[in-house]
């Protein structure tokens, strides 16, 4: 009976050793993953969208800036004048469009009707005169030239009458739809020009897009800039990202949302906390900046890690050690 008992105990011990070894191996696989990266360098060149003479600059190299802060201004005068012109253009176009919609006043219609009566009387007189001249020409009393003059006067009076009748007809029926549409299009064009003038005036003031530190100041007050010319280069300080690389064997551990610990040489015992925000969908050869020798010939995937408790001591370009593990994953 003792021999089976000993064998049973040996099997139990062996199973425990195997299970413990497997657990240790898995924990080492998970907890032991260490990556090396750098704090991402994020800079932006700031410029005016419009051109002009630099009136003032409010910051200098090394200054900390806040989102929404005024950094500089161009001479506003040209853009203020353009805005006034655009507003006047809208007023003129609006008045013309309103006239087209309203049609003609009763007084204008009455004047047009009176003009028709006057033109009708002139035509009747010219027609009668021409008829008389025709009879005289047949009796050889007047020359052919006199008859032609009478015909010309009659034709001119007829044209004047037709013009007056057309004008009265237009006044009574109102403006044509095509004319109204053209006036509306002119108004919309003037409104668009006004919006552009307002935007240009607004863009003659340079506003900080986000928090950061001013690295370089490329111009001074009095400089005449073309649109898009660089004025400042700014280092963006928030959010802080760490760029690291992981090989395919450990890719399953580097999933978006995974929490990690971030160590720097200046704080070896007080890590920062981060969370994986992005994993590149494509592999690439390891950049030269990666410090791990065994990764330099591998294809790796780029990670972006968002630092959740960053401070001013975490500077761009600084090397960082990224530690995976249960402690990081559950904090």
From Swiss-Prot:
GN (gene name): ybhG
Keyword Amino-acid biosynthesis found: no
Alphabetical keyword list: Coiled coil, Periplasm, Signal
Coiled-coil residue windows: 107-208
Lineage: Bacteria, Pseudomonadati, Pseudomonadota, Gammaproteobacteria, Enterobacterales
Localization (cell): Periplasm
CC per GO annotation: periplasmic space
Major subcellular site: periplasm
Top-rank lineage group of the source organism: Bacteria
Pfam annotation, one family: HlyD_D23
Similarity-based family: Belongs to the UPF0194 family.
Signal peptide feature range: 1-15
PANTHER family listed in its UniProt record: EFFLUX SYSTEM COMPONENT YKNX-RELATED, UPF0194 MEMBRANE PROTEIN YBHG
Protein name listed in UniProt: UPF0194 membrane protein YbhG
């Amino acid at each position: 009976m003792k021999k089976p008992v000993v064998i049973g105990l040996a099997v139990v011990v062996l199973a425990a050793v195997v299970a413990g070894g497997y657990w240790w191996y898995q924990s080492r696989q998970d907890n032991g993953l260490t990556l090396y990266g750098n704090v991402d360098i994020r800079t932006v060149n700031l410029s005016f969208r419009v051109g002009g003479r630099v009136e003032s600059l409010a910051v200098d190299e090394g200054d900390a800036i806040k989102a929404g802060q005024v950094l500089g201004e161009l001479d506003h005068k040209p853009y203020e004048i353009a805005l006034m012109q655009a507003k006047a253009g809208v007023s003129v176009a609006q008045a013309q469009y309103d006239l087209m919609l309203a049609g003609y006043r009763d007084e204008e219609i009455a004047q047009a009707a009176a003009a028709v009566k006057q033109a009708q009387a002139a035509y009747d007189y010219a027609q009668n005169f021409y008829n008389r001249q025709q009879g005289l020409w047949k009796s050889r009393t007047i020359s052919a030239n006199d008859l032609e003059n009478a015909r010309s006067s009659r034709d001119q009076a007829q044209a004047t009458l037709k013009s007056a009748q057309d004008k009265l007809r237009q006044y009574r029926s109102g403006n044509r739809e095509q004319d109204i549409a053209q006036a509306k299009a002119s108004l919309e064009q003037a409104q668009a020009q006004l919006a552009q003038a307002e935007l240009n005036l607004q863009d003659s003031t340079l506003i900080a897009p986000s928090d950061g530190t001013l690295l370089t100041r490329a111009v001074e007050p009095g400089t005449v800039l073309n649109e898009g010319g660089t004025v400042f280069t700014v280092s963006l300080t928030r959010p802080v990202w760490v760029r690291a690389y992981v090989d395919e064997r450990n890719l399953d551990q580097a999933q978006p949302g995974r929490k990690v610990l971030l160590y720097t040489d200046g704080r070896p015992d007080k890590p920062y906390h981060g969370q994986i925000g992005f994993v590149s969908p494509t592999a690439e050869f390891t950049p030269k900046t990666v410090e791990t020798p065994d990764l330099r010939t591998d294809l790796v995937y780029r990670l972006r890690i968002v630092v959740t408790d960053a401070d001013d001591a975490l500077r761009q370009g600084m090397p960082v050690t990224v530690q995976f593990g249960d402690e990081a994953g559950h904090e």
